[in-house]
């Protein structure tokens, strides 16, 4: 796994192994969100920005063997993973994979009952977000739904890490997103407003808290260990106090000191907004 968990497209925090750990750590909440999207048997669903395919089995279960799934991602290596995963699904629907961009979908108008997009919008600029929403609206059938999920990392907590220290790190990190012009990992709570501004009717919006106390499950420990290593790798590029930089260097060497603490707690928050066309 690369130091910044990049795909071949250069997107950070989106390498397949990283995505898999994060998905398994948050599985109950992710499953609840997908069920809440309202996907029905027999539907044609586009997984727009499918990553390594974590949501594919859940979508397949929702649409059943009479349904159809198109899985699209920019990274060819992610599509390779999805193709292998599709072959293991029990009583699978038809699954078609595509290397491509959500900004220019390779599908005909009114092709899908649902477009699902999880943890993708954070990588887009506001203009690209509007373009992606326009493309989703184009390929949806009348009455179809667009379900968009993303994080609000302003609520990220990793206890017993000093909250002020993490707040300084996250402020620098979020400013980096602003400087690059992308929505960033705090965009989740802004999704309903952005979708309305793009001319869509938001029919539901809901947030989920992912909370894991010590002793944390294995997937959570592995994910947070990787997350801490990632944060430590980017911290030198931020204007943080010397004491903060020293903390991140030490934590990179000894992450289990935090993970093994009896008061360890990891919290993250995400929001899903559902629109009807």
Located regions from the model:
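Conserved alpha-helix/loop element of class I SAM-dependent methyltransferases that forms part
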Residues: 24-43, 58
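A short SAM/SAH-binding and catalytic strip from SAM-dependent methyltransferases
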Residues: 113-128
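Conserved catalytic/acceptor-binding region of the Class I
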Residues: 147-216
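Class I SAM-dependent methyltransferase SAM/SAH-binding core
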Residues: 46-48, 52-104
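Conserved Class I S-adenosyl-L-methionine
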Residues: 189-190, 203-277
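A short glycine-rich, Lys/Arg-flanked "PGG" loop and its adjoining helix->strand segment in the class I
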Residues: 130-145
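Class I SAM-dependent methyltransferase Rossmann-like catalytic core
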Residues: 2-27
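A short acidic, Gly/Pro-enriched loop at the edge of an enzyme's catalytic core
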Residues: 103-115
């Amino acid at each position: 796994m690369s130091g910044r968990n990049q795909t071949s497209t250069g997107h950070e925090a989106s390498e397949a192994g990283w995505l898999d750990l994060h998905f398994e750590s948050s599985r109950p909440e992710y499953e609840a969100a997908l069920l809440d999207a309202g996907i029905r048997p027999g539907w044609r669903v586009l997984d727009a920005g499918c990553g390594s395919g974590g949501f594919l089995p859940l979508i397949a279960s929702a649409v059943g063997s009479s349904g159809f799934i198109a899985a699209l991602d920019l990274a060819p290596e992610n599509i390779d993973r999805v193709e292998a995963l599709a072959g293991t699904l029990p009583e699978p629907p038809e699954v078609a994979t595509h290397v491509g961009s959500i900004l220019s979908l390779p599908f005909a108008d009114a092709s899908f009952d649902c477009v699902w997009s999880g943890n993708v919008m954070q990588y887009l600029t506001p203009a690209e977000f509007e373009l992606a929403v326009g493309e989703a609206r184009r390929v949806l059938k009348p009455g179809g739904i667009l379900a968009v999920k993303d994080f609000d990392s302003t609520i990220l907590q990793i206890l017993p890490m000093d909250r002020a220290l993490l707040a300084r790190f996250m402020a620098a990190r979020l400013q980096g997103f602003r400087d690059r012009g992308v929505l960033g990992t705090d965009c989740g709570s802004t999704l309903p407003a952005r979708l309305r501004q793009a001319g869509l009717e938001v029919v539901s919006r809901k947030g989920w808290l992912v909370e894991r106390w010590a002793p944390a499950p294995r997937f959570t420990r592995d994910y947070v260990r990787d997350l801490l290593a990632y944060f430590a790798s980017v911290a030198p590029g931020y204007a943080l106090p010397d004491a903060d930089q020293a903390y991140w260097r030490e934590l990179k060497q000894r992450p289990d000191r935090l993970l093994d603490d009896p008061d360890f707690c990891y919290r993250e928050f995400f929001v899903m907004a559902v629109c009807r066309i």
